[in-house]
């Protein structure tokens, strides 16, 4: 059986996994109305999906030293199915919160297991396949709001009934294809989670600092983007749609970036992406007028989504077989933790009286210093990373 078909089933799963995380945001108003809760509780429900996504990454990495990649992906599919069904059937807020957290857990387990597995399925095309896989994920972010709009014509719970059915079917297809496909045994030597992670600590740290801090700025920007645009004088409806523009710009970015990640030196390429993102943030700040703001938003959306397949390729292509899953799990957990506070920091700064322009320019300036430091270290040959065949990063 073709590995491409197996990869296709993983693209279907990642679409559903990411859809399950992002679909809660358009439903906040429905939760407030149906369950008679306040904005804070509704916000907590949305947050639980992302907390759940971060929580299992280290345990999932350990599980990959005991069980096959395919089995852990199967578990994530079952968790997604059960979580989606739980949300659809939730009679009250406690059940809804538990089910939402379960959906988040499923996504965290999936990412930690699937990304190394995909890199091992196509070791000579890591960037391209990570780009395609990421593009499938990004399509879910674009589709979430329209799907919810259609579901609301009838009942918002229909979106989760449909998600549960699709997750169960996609998981079954993945299992069937995995059984018929000759899969690599690259991960069989990765049996000591702590030793594997410790052996690659320099590479993990390099990845977490650069991609984590960039994502920190991104989290702070996009979660306040609508309010920022309104503050700049953009109409409320238009401001809301600008987020869709940003996410839509990310769809081709994954594919383009994945291809380039296979061809260009990892660290200089990453620094180029982050620098371009910084330019986009500055353009958003200085832009005036709708056309200029839309153009700047496209730059931000395209460049930030280029980062994700490039960062994954940097790690996965540089890690040796005997530590790939363990080290990637630690990197993934570290990056999620680093970026998580971005929205909180921006919110606190705005509440303290700082202006949006000043906050985002300050964040961009801080990130520019990080890029400069990496450029100096890369010139001196001090940033780890290279081909996996070369052995552990030094």
Locations of regions flagged by a protein language model:
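Cytoplasmic helix-loop-helix junction between adjacent transmembrane helices
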Residues: 97-139
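A late C-terminal transmembrane helix in Major Facilitator Superfamily
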Residues: 318-354, 363
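Extracytoplasmic gate region of multi-pass secondary transporters
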Residues: 25, 201-254, 258
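Helix-breaking motifs and short loop linkers at transmembrane-helix boundaries and internal kinks
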Residues: 36, 68, 86-94, 106, ...
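Helix-loop-helix hairpin linking two adjacent transmembrane segments in secondary transporters
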Residues: 124, 132-179
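Structural signature of the two symmetry-related core transmembrane helices
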Residues: 71-86, 268-283
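Helix-to-loop junctions at the C-terminal end of transmembrane segments
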Residues: 56-68, 253-265, 351
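A membrane-interface helix-boundary motif in multi-pass transporters
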Residues: 152-165, 347-367
């Amino acid at each position: 059986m073709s590995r491409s078909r197996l990869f296709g089933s993983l693209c279907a799963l990642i679409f559903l996994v990411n859809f399950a995380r992002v679909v809660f945001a358009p439903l906040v108003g429905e939760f407030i109305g149906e369950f008679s809760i306040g904005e804070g509780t509704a916000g907590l429900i949305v947050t639980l999906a992302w907390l759940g996504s971060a929580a299992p990454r280290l345990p999932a990495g350990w599980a990959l030293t005991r069980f096959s990649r395919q089995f852990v992906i199967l578990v994530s599919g079952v968790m997604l199915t059960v979580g989606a069904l739980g949300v659809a059937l939730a009679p009250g807020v406690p059940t809804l919160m538990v089910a939402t957290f379960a959906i988040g857990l499923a996504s965290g387990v999936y990412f930690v297991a699937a990304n190394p597995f995909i890199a091992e399925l196509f070791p000579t095309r890591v960037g391209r396949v990570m780009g395609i896989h990421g593009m499938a994920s990004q399509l879910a972010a674009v589709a979430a709001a329209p799907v919810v709009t259609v579901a609301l014509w009838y009942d918002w719970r229909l979106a989760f009934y449909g998600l549960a059915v699709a997750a169960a079917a996609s998981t079954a297809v993945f299992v069937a294809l995995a059984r018929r496909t000759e899969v690599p045994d690259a991960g069989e030597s990765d049996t000591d989670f702590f030793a594997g992670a410790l052996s690659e600590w320099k590479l993990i740290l390099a990845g977490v600092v650069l991609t984590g801090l960039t994502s920190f700025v991104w989290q702070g920007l996009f979660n306040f983007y609508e309010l920022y645009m309104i503050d700049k004088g953009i109409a409320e409806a238009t401001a809301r749609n600008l987020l869709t523009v940003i996410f839509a710009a990310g769809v081709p970015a994954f594919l383009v970036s994945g291809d380039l990640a296979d061809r260009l030196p990892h660290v200089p390429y990453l620094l180029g992406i982050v620098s371009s993102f910084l330019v986009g943030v500055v353009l958003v700040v200085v832009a005036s007028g709708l056309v200029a703001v839309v153009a700047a938003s496209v730059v931000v959306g395209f460049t930030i989504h280029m980062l994700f397949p490039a960062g994954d390729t940097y790690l996965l292509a540089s890690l040796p077989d005997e530590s790939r899953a363990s080290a990637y799990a630690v990197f993934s957990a570290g990056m999620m933790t680093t970026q998580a506070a971005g929205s909180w920091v921006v919110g606190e700064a705005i509440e303290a009286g700082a202006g949006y322009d000043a906050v985002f320019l300050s964040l961009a300036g801080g990130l520019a210093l990080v890029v400069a430091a990496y450029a100096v270290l890369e010139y001196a040959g001090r940033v780890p990373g290279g081909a996996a065949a070369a052995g552990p990063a030094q």
